[in-house]
Amino acid sequence: KPFSTGISNVVHFADWIPGTNSIAFSTVEPRATAPGWQANNDLHRYSISTGERRKILDASSGGVYGWWGMTFAFSPEGRLAYARPDGIGLVDLDGKYLKPLLDITPLNTHSDWAWLPSLTWGADGKVLYFVSHAPPPSLVSEEDSPFFDISATSFESDATMQIAGQTGMFAYPSASSLQSSSRERQYQVAYLQAIFPSQSETRRYRLVVMDRDGSNRRTIFPANDAPGLEPQTPAWAPDPIDGQSGDFIAVVYQGNLWLVDSGNGQAYQVTGDGLVTRIDWK
């Protein structure tokens, strides 16, 4: 039976904490002026069982363009990464402070919104994938560069490298579950590739799948002669489904739910009313 948590003014982040019955969330203060809020850049924990609410991070300015806010991502084991307009890092949940990993040149949108680097953990929790703001191709300001890459930080080798170039600002990398049939702990990464990388703020995207190291990159949906996807995070099926050559990836395309086989690129339209806006696997 649904019940109210009493939590309000959440814009960028709320998610289950892995292995617990608690939710982590960040809040904003409503404002009459655009974009409609002032981010607190805080983090709280709420227990579904007891209703207890605990603070993890105090409110802060949030760095460059901190008024927009920040977002977070849990690894399968419960490590927490953060992203804000000027960088990414980890959250020390015991010490309750931020541990910066990498500075990112913030994007000057010349508007009342800010770009947040999207990020996701690899299925083994050893790699953090994120979208980074690439240097400009000419003499324009670094903050005005129209190019974005997908990079990865390995916590085993303590190294960061680019694995996909000029993807677009809304690439939204997403890692599959571990492939149990393999001797190695392998997984794939899906992301959105801008059709026109230098205009990725307003143009559409195609779904791409690659191995965890960026190799074997394949564009699988939609067809080259079809309109592209609106920005979204590709949603991997949590487990393999019999009869498919790869794992299913769910996307919203032209208002409908589609399932795309990551192995052969076969796509299946599930709904037809054009009313789907958000999706998730259960």
Indicate where each model-derived feature is located.
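Sequence signature of WD/YWTD-type beta-propeller architectures
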Residues: 1-282
